[in-house]
Every structure is written in C-alpha cells, then in structure tokens.
C-alpha cells in the first residue's frame, strides 16, 4: 500500500496564509442561488469536492451554473425552475449536500434518488427523514437509521410543522427551513443548543424573512428568494489547523487572512484564548464578520470544553485534541457524541491516531480526556477517508522528532482544502 510520507521535525512556521472559502457558506450560496430568481454571483467559493458535489447536483436539476472571471455565476429561476433529474444525484462525501438538498427538494413535484460514497453511506439520515415526513414528503433510506441511498418524492403541498430538534444539528435545521420556504403556513424549529446560523442569515440575505428568537426560528411560507452577490470569507474550520500549528510549534508566527468569524463558529477562538493562546485580531470587520488573526507560539494549559460551546466548534474538535496533547494538564471534551457520526467516528479515530503517535488520550462515550504535554513519535496513519483527520495528522507530524509519519488515503483532504499541502510547504519555507 502506498502511503504519503508527511513532513516531520518542522522548524518554526512563518508567513501569511489565505485559507480557502468557507465550506458551509459556499454550499448555501449555491443552494439558495439555484432557487432564487435572477443571476447570483459568488466570489471566494470553496472549490473542494463537497461543494462541487452540490454544484453538480443543481446542474442535474436543470440550473445553469458556470465560472466567469473567478466567480461562480448561477442562473436561478426560482423554486419552480428546478426540473426532475435524468440521473441519480451523487453527493459524494458531502453530508451537507445530501441533507440540505433533500430539504430543498421536499417541495418539488418529482422524485429523486440520492446516493453518496462509502463514508456518506454510513451516516444516518433519520434526523432529516422524520421531520420531512411530517411535512408530507415520501422519503426513505436503508434500515431504521435511514442510511443512504435516499429515495425522495417531493410534495407541492408541504405542511408547516413545529419541530424540536432532538440533536444539535445545523444541517437538520437547514433542511427543515429550506422545505419551509415552500410550505404554506408557519414552520417553527426549536434548537437544543444554538448551532451555526449561516442558513438563517443567508435566507435573509437572499430576501427571505424569518424570525430568530433565541433557540426558536419561525418562518412563514411560501416565499420567493432574489439573486444576490455573495463574497465567501475564509473558512475558520480550515484556519483552525494553522491556528493550532502556530500555537504548538516553537518559534512560529502566522497571519491568517480574511477568516470568517460568525459568532456561531468561533468556539475555537474562545477555547484557545482560555488555554493561554497569544492571538491578535487585525482588520476586524464586525459587519461582514471577517478578521485576520495573528498567532504566535504559546504555552497552553488544559481546559474543559462542553455544553453550548460544542456546536460552535464541532468540526474543530480533532485539531483541538491535538492542541490539548501539547498543553499542560488535562483537557476534558464532553457532550460531543455527535462526533461519532461524522465522516468517521471522530472520537475513536482521533484517539487511536494520536495515541499511536504517543499521546495520552482516553475516549469516552461523548468525548475525550487528554493529558499533556506529550512527545509525539512517528507512526503509520490513515485519514480513514476523513479530511479533518488527515489535516490533524499532518499538523501532528510537524512535531515529530523521531521516526516517520506515513498517511494513507490523503486524497480525502481534497474535500475541504485542496491546497493544504502546498500551503504547508510554503509556511515551512517562508
């Protein structure tokens, strides 16, 4: 088996980095642009494989989408402009694509079959199947957990619902809201904990109306959306890898440019500051929720991460676990059972990967207990088809002084950060 040899024993990281566009916002710009009326233009779109799956799905649904002058141009014809696809919609590795597009297609008068790759086919879709069924959609997957492939027959006469989310999931909330835009009457979604709110913000940006009152979101449908010009900020989930690298590799100083800092996504910044990180915000634009972040090597101490903080840093927990292996004392991550149904069981995979390199991590049902600081050593590792595990391992390898680190299935990183290794080499040489 051919494995990629990762860079080890890195000196200080120096330089400036512009991380790729935010994945969550890129998906939603394409989805809302496809059903808005008029020409939507998107600058700074992430061209990772997940977002390309969303774009291809809408092309198969009859939407004209093309690239012009470094922008994505979407010719939306409104909700009525979608047409029945001639083929199965393949969502690749993207849970966001499958769940949000299922919600959107709930109100369409045709049937579709949605499939995914091996990893996506192991991710439960019961969380969207149940609320969409309540709205009058015929939708089903495999077994009780409703694993893909999904078969969906839309309904032009969707029923509004009031739905309390059993789990904290922005994807489930978004699927219901996208369906609610096509339902006649008042739909309410009640969250357990506040999750990322890009869907609510962007529905309003596209001229839609909804009311957010704490954990309750109210939307009266049906509504039409109007095309917009969207600029996608850098993805804080991608910036997180460089943030952590800068904090744990002695002598490092990095400037992360144009990072999106929507408050529902900035949990990692609060955590690292509590742990003692030296970070400075430059050129902060509060209205656009964008800033540059200067990070320097810091001595860190362990912390507790739990409760309402978890949905605000759920995707950053693998790299936070690595950070904790280099902090003084114990870091405890709780209430994060959602990690077990991501692209992989991230609790188990993070624990196994970092422990194989010498870390001291105990997996729990809903998180991890991490003792630090520990020296990391060479090991044979894999992404297990999970982009965030791959990038976490590549950053961990930089700390290794003894032995080699080999990584299997590194192509998974293309999902969200196609230029990751190129950027890594540049920061090691600047």
UniProtKB/Swiss-Prot annotation:
The active site is at 315 (proton acceptor). It is found in: Cytoplasm. One of its GO terms (biological process) is aromatic amino acid family biosynthetic process. It catalyses: 3-phosphoshikimate + phosphoenolpyruvate = 5-O-(1-carboxyvinyl)-3-phosphoshikimate + phosphate. Disulfide bonds: none annotated. The keyword Membrane does not apply. Its EC number is 2.5.1.19. GO terms for cellular component: cytoplasm. It is an enzyme of class 2 (transferase). Its main location: cytoplasm. Belongs to the EPSP synthase family. This is 3-phosphoshikimate 1-carboxyvinyltransferase. The gene is aroA.
């Amino acid at each position: 088996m051919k494995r990629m040899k990762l860079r080890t024993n890195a000196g200080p990281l120096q330089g400036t980095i512009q991380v790729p566009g935010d994945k969550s916002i890129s998906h939603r710009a394409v989805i809302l642009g496809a059903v808005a009326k008029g020409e939507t233009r998107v600058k700074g779109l992430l061209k990772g494989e997940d977002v390309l799956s969303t774009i291809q799905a809408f092309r198969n649904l009859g939407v004209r989408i093309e690239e012009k002058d470094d922008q994505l141009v979407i010719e939306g014809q409104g909700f009525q402009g979608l047409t029945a696809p001639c083929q199965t919609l393949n969502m690749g590795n993207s849970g966001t694509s499958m769940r949000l597009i299922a919600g959107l297609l709930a109100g369409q008068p045709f049937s579709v079959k949605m499939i995914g790759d091996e990893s996506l086919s192991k991710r439960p879709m019961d969380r969207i199947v149940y609320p969409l069924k309540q709205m009058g959609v015929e939708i089903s997957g495999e077994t009780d957990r409703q694993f893909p492939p999904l078969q969906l027959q839309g309904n032009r006469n969707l029923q509004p619902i009031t739905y309390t989310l059993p789990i904290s999931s922005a994807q489930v909330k978004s699927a219901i809201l996208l369906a609610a835009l096509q339902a006649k009457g008042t739909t309410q979604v009640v969250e357990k904990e506040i999750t990322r709110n890009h869907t609510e913000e962007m529905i309003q940006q596209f001229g839609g109306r909804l009311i957010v009152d704490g954990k309750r979101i109210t939307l009266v449908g049906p509504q039409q959306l109007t095309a917009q010009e969207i600029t996608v900020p850098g993805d804080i989930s991608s910036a997180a890898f460089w943030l952590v690298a800068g904090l744990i590799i002695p002598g490092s100083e990095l400037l992360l440019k144009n990072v999106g800092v929507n408050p529902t996504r900035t949990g990692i910044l609060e955590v690292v500051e509590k742990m003692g990180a030296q970070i400075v915000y430059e050129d902060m634009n509060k209205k656009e929720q964008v800033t540059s972040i200067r990070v320097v090597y810091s001595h860190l101490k362990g912390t507790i991460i739990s409760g309402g903080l978890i949905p605000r840093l759920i995707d950053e927990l693998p790299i936070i676990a690595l950070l904790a292996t280099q902090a003084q004392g114990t870091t405890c991550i709780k209430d994060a059972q959602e990690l077990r149904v991501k692209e992989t069981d991230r609790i188990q995979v993070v624990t196994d990967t970092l422990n194989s390199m010498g870390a001291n991590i105990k997996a729990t049902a809903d998180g991890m207990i991490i003792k630090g600081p520990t020296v990391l050593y060479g090991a044979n590792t894999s992404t297990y088809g999970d982009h965030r595990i791959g990038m976490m391992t590549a950053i961990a390898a930089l700390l290794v002084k003894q032995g080699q680190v080999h990584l299997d299935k590194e192509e998974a990183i293309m999902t969200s950060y196609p230029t990751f290794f190129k950027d890594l080499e540049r920061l090691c040489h600047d």
